[in-house]
Design a protein with these regions (language model features):
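Short acidic (Asp/Glu) and glycine-rich catalytic loops that position anionic groups and cofactors
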Residues: 1, 22-29, 66-68, 181-182, ...
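Short, conserved aromatic-histidine micro-motifs
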Residues: 56-61, 217-221, 289-293
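Gly/Ser/Thr-rich beta-alpha loop segments that engage phosphate groups in nucleotides
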Residues: 34, 190, 194, 273
Length: 293
């Protein structure tokens, strides 16, 4: 696939930066950060424009907090000016992140999403005898910076854009607990960044193509790091799963225990329990829904 260049000029166009401001401010128009930025919007956008063009830009000013729904996650909220930057980049780069994604990956994509993924999965549940569910351990925290930078360089050739991507990527490192907390060098993208959603989706794109084109899996669906594989030959499916596990380990990822069942038994996926001819809320989703009532 031909790499794309000359995008920095489009990213730094004042109309694009203004659009990025409105996207970043959506739902937060009364916050102090938005108000401060808006009061000098022309000056602030010009400053951001010059910082992008010069490469002299500060990123990684995160506010950390935890959420517990449906499980504990560390969220990293970037500063408002940084969120404007993220939107400015993705307003322009979004279609180029889309180009090499397979049809059956459903996260962070216009016209896709959870319910389209469930609908597609239901077809597999009806058509095939076996289903395997794969889930990557601590996916966002395990993304290798060097590998991600290399993958982005296969999509984009603009050196200033790649420098900007790398600066955003290396502004964060995941923290792991091992007796005492310590930083793991060179891994992780922050949950909460708009850019992280695109980076994380792209990180597994080559794996998608490996599964579909080299292994020839009959039907395969991915929603970020949650994957379903379908087939009628259990032995073949087991062999394919071993090869996928090996492929993921090459890019620093490890799977949680794989679930391989007959489709008639059902499988949990994206908060639902899927059967050949019905889809139900799973137990955890039911409890979460009741708490919100």
């Amino acid at each position: 696939m031909k790499r794309v260049g000359f995008l920095i000029e489009k990213i730094t166009d004042m109309n694009n930066l203004m659009l990025a401001f409105y996207k970043a401010a959506k739902g937060k128009t009364m916050s102090d950060d938005v108000e401060i930025f808006r009061n000098n919007i022309e000056q602030n956008l010009q400053k951001l424009r010059l910082q992008i063009l010069s490469g002299n830009i500060c990123v990684g000013k995160y506010h950390y907090f935890k959420i517990y729904d449906p499980k504990e996650r560390l969220i990293c909220a970037a500063s408002f000016d940084e969120r404007v930057l993220h939107h400015a980049i993705m307003n322009i780069c979004h279609p180029y992140f889309e180009r090499n994604l397979i049809c059956d990956t459903y996260a962070t994509r216009i016209g896709k999403g959870v319910y389209k993924a469930l609908k597609r999965a239901k077809i597999g549940m009806e058509k095939y005898q076996y289903v395997a569910k794969l889930d990557v351990k601590k996916y966002f925290d395990s993304i290798d910076h060097d590998v991600l930078v290399q993958k982005l360089a296969r999509l984009f050739k603009d050196k200033r854009l790649l420098f900007l991507f790398e600066k955003i990527i290396r502004s964060y490192e995941s923290i792991v607990a091992n007796g005492t907390e310590r930083k793991r060098q060179g891994k992780g993208v922050p949950i909460g960044n708009l850019t992280s959603q695109y980076f994380a989706n792209q990180y597994l794109s080559a794996t998608d193509h490996f599964i579909k084109e080299q292994l020839g899996v009959s039907q395969y669906i991915r929603y970020m790091d949650d994957m379903l594989l379908f087939g009628n030959d259990k032995t073949l499916l087991k062999q394919q799963l071993l090869e996928i596990d090996g492929h993921l380990q090459q890019i620093g990822l490890h799977l949680k225990p794989i679930v391989l069942n007959k489709t008639s038994i059902g499988v949990s996926f994206l908060g639902y329990k899927l059967y050949p001819y019905k889809i139900l809320l799973n137990r955890r989703s039911k409890l979460r829904f009741k708490k919100k009532l």
